[in-house]
Curated annotation (Swiss-Prot):
Classification of source organism: Eukaryota, Fungi, Dikarya, Ascomycota, Taphrinomycotina
Functional summary from the UniProt entry: Has a role in the regulation of cell polarity, growth and division.
Active-site positions on this chain: 133
Annotated positions binding ATP: 16-24, 39
Composition skew (Acidic residues), residue ranges: 299-311
One Pfam match: Pkinase
Stated name of the protein: Serine/threonine-protein kinase nak1
Residue intervals of the Protein kinase domain: 10-264
Organism superkingdom: Eukaryota
Residue positions where Phosphoserine is found in the record: 541
Localization of this protein: Cytoplasm
Length: 652
């Protein structure tokens, strides 16, 4: 155990995992005695790299506020000299990759792991985050069976320029084809491809092309058909992986759709407590003498190559916190046990005691000289950092000064805004002046400046919910700011934009440019003078028999004509009624006032006095009013037809 002072909020214990960019230790909160995981990153680097770290920690802060169950909980960040301590939840079960060493994982448990991972991906994708490193080593399982997604691109943000190319070469096995292809952008669907490779990895024990050289794997992923799961597996699992591994991104199912897939729904009633059996099986296997590959190899080979051909002197533990993403990264990143100014190195020996790795000794290096102009201090100068911060060794161990104390400074990062990314935007916009990249949604980093590559494929249109997110594009397309859509206004407020069908109920003698509420000539209700028991004539004049028109009906009002005849209004209700049978010689007797007719009320033109901005409400109310009037007109016509038939029968 490291001898920390009383001022330190956390006590760092044994090493539980190591990557090319940092290390993870088990720790204890001195206040609550809670077991936590401490990820230590060396920040003694350039200013732009520190800015990337600040942005990523700000993303973790946003995730902390959301308190999502399937995402590793972030407790805070502390500056210890030139080291950044990221405090997270500790998962005793380790990663899924480590649990696979005790034996194959059954399909029901695979479904549970994928279901919980999809819940996490659904949240971060809707929040505007691309994980970019989905694999079994980044999916943790707690002792109670809870699945946690971890490692949200801190290592990827640290790797810029030269290191970015190394990351690309070292970990191609989980990458989507659009990520590998030169000059092609990608979005959240790259994570869906990686999830399909992860499902393949859990089922078979290794990702596709695991035995190939990384350069060969890059070529195969970009130029061959997507891999398919073969062997003694269920058809539902094969279908799930095939729906993820589509070469064209827009053909892949998103996280919400995958949660509704048959393979996930088949085991939807299973509890996550079933995964505790997988953790217990691993503990039993280890107690029986099983040695994890992380103990044999140090850093686990994430590229899936044969472990017998790999050598490493990096120590790690059996808890399975494998965060390494670069196969040959030790030569490019400062060692976690020394700083950039150190000239001496010390090998850390370790012994296995009850499944944990406890360092015996470590060489304490001289701390670098204090420099107030360090980019780290300049970047976080607005944060609440105490003035007595002093650098320590790169491992985060307590380098005691003359008083034997080390300073801890909690970082309270500001939220992401445009000022944090102003320098990056200017660089990107100078390269891509023809594209409004600040509004491209969820676009990943561009592997090349060339935008005319023949290998580019069609971009997937993002889901409707995702399209509401506004991306403030930096180097790698991470955003957390939702976009507020503008107020939707009608395209025009003049009468020309209205339906011409209104002309069937309005007098069109007034010019069309006049305001709608000033139309006063309306089709008046059909007024019928009713009389009682007036017998119809028993004989009909021959001249009347050949005149089926209604011109002699004095009760029918005349409508003023217009230069342009309005189109008839085709009512939906009229389309469902049988055709009228009025055009017969018996029409003339019905032209008098001797039949009972239903009243038809006029259209309320006061609806047009409302503000034009409420056009949507006016349209709804007007549609209802028109349907009511048409219904009354149809009833009136049916009554007229019935009277006609009765009169015809009476005459006969």
């Amino acid at each position: 155990m490291e001898n920390n002072t009383a001022s330190s909020p956390y006590t760092k214990l044994e090493l539980v995992g190591r990557g090319s960019y940092g290390a993870v230790y088990r720790g204890i909160c001195n206040l609550t005695k809670e077991t936590v995981a401490i990820k230590i990153l060396n920040l003694d680097t350039d200013e732009d790299e520190v800015s990337d770290i600040q942005k990523e920690v700000a993303v973790l802060s946003e995730l902390k506020q959301s308190d999502v169950e399937n995402i590793i909980k972030y407790h805070g960040s502390y500056l210890v000299g030139t080291n950044l301590w990221i405090i997270m939840d500790y998962c005793h079960g380790g990663s899924v990759r480590t649990l696979m060493e005790a034996g194959p994982i059954s399909e029901p448990c695979i479904s549970l792991i994928l279901r919980e991972t999809l819940q996490a991906l659904k949240f971060i994708h809707h929040a505007g985050i691309i994980h970019r490193d989905i694999k079994a080593a980044n999916i943790l399982v707690s002792m109670s069976g809870n699945v946690k997604l971890c490692d949200f691109g801190v290592a990827a943000e640290l790797n810029i320029n030269r290191r970015k190319r190394i990351t690309f070469i070292g970990t191609p096995y989980w990458m989507a084809p659009e990520v590998i292809r030169d000059g092609q952008e990608y979005n959240v669907m790259a994570d869906i491809w990686s999830l399909g490779i992860t499902a393949y990895e859990i089922a078979t024990g290794s990702p596709p092309h695991a035995k190939e050289d990384p350069f060969r794997a890059v070529y195969l992923i970009a130029h061959t058909a997507p891999p398919r799961l073969n062997g003694n597996f269920s058809a539902l699992l094969k279908e799930f992986i095939a729906s993820c591994l589509q070469d064209v991104p827009q053909r892949r199912l998103d996280s919400s759709e995958l949660l509704k897939s048959k393979f996930i729904k088949q085991y939807s009633r299973m509890s996550i407590s079933e995964l505790t059996n997988v953790v217990k099986r691993y503990d039993t296997w280890q107690a029986a003498g099983g040695i994890p590959q992380t103990l044999l190899l140090g850093e686990e080979a994430d590229d899936g190559s044969d472990p017998d051909q790999e050598t490493s002197d990096t120590a790690a533990s059996d808890d399975g916190w494998e965060f390494g993403t670069i196969k040959q990264g030790q030569s490019n990143v400062s060692s976690i046990t020394g700083t950039s100014t150190s000239t001496t190195t010390a090998a850390t020996s370790s012994t296995t005691v009850t499944g944990t790795v406890i360092p015996k000794s470590s060489t304490v290096h001289e701390p670098p000289s204090s420099n107030d102009s360090h980019p780290l201090l300049q970047l976080f100068k607005d944060s609440k950092i105490s003035d007595d911060d002093s650098p320590s060794n790169a491992e985060g161990a307590s380098t005691e000064d003359s008083k034997g104390e080390v300073s801890y400074s909690q970082i309270e990062l500001p939220s992401l805004d445009s000022s944090n990314l102003s320098s990056k935007k200017s660089t990107i916009q100078s390269k891509h002046t023809k594209q409004a990249e600040d509004y491209d949604l969820f676009v990943g980093r561009t592997r090349s400046n060339s935008k005319t590559s023949s290998d580019q494929s069609i971009k997937r249109p993002l889901p409707r919910v995702v399209q509401r997110q506004k991306t403030s594009l930096g180097k790698r397309g991470i955003s957390m700011s939702p976009m507020k859509p503008g107020l939707r206004m009608p395209s025009s407020f003049d009468l020309q934009s209205r339906s011409i069908s209104m002309g069937a109920f309005e007098q069109l003698s007034t010019p069309l440019e006049a305001p709608a509420h000033k139309h006063s000539a309306v089709l008046q209700p059909l007024e019928v003078n009713r009389s009682i028991s007036i017998p119809p004539p028993k004989s009909i004049s021959p001249s009347i028999l050949h005149k089926p028109s209604l011109e002699s009906a004095s009760s029918t009002p005349k409508i003023s004509s217009c230069s342009s005849t309005p189109k008839p209004f085709n009512s939906k209700l009229r389309a469902h009624l049988p055709p009228l049978s009025i055009g017969s010689p018996a029409v003339q007797p019905l032209a008098n006032d001797n039949y009972d007719s239903l009243g038809v009320r006029g259209l309320n033109m006061e609806l047009f006095n409302d503000y034009p901005g409420n056009m949507h409400n006016i349209k709804s109310v007007l549609s209802l009013e028109i349907d009511i009037v048409l219904g009354e007109m149809d009833a009136c016509l049916k009554s007229l037809e019935c009277n006609l038939l009765n009169r015809k029968a009476y005459n006969e």
